């Protein structure tokens, strides 16, 4: 049980750290250029470049990722906000995983699928991040909806049960 408790905290911290770090990188010219081919070929996002310039699109993603990370980090005190942040993270990772289809993530020199290209290798990890975001969503949803007495709650939920 202690290992599970530690692992859950590590998953949440890791997700928050990644969202903060990758979000902060979106404010650099290098990252704005790096995501351009992904966004340009996406059926869900390509329209953004018709409205905004390269850096603005990247900055929008950065603000979104950092905000989601902050909301997820607030789970112990504001689980309702963590639900929203986790939902944004789930949508973010579903979108980035769609890049595997819209920008082929397979290496043609190695025969294509299942040989991952550099971009494909970078994106495939988002399956784990998606799973983590879904887990944080479920945990925050459960914490938000505690209707039973604090005695029935998990130890970390008891701590914050009277603050809601």
How should each PLM-predicted stretch be described?
Residues 1-164:
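Membrane-interface extramembranous regions
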């Amino acid at each position: 049980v202690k290992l599970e408790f530690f692992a859950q905290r590590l998953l949440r911290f890791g997700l928050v750290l990644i969202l903060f770090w990758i979000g902060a990188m979106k404010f650099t010219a290098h990252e704005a250029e790096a995501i351009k081919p992904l966004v340009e070929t996406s059926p869900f996002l390509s329209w953004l470049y018709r409205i905004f310039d390269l850096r603005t699109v990247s900055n929008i993603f950065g603000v979104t990722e950092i905000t989601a990370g902050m909301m997820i980090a607030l789970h112990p005190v504001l689980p309702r906000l963590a639900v929203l942040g986790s939902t944004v993270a789930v949508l973010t990772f579903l979108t980035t995983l769609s890049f595997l289809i819209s920008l082929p993530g397979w290496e043609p020199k190695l025969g294509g699928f299942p040989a991952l290209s550099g971009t494909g290798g970078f994106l495939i990890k988002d399956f784990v991040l998606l799973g983590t975001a879904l887990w944080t969503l479920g945990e925050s949803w459960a914490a938000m909806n505690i209707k039973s007495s604090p005695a029935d709650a998990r130890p970390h939920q008891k701590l914050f049960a009277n603050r809601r």
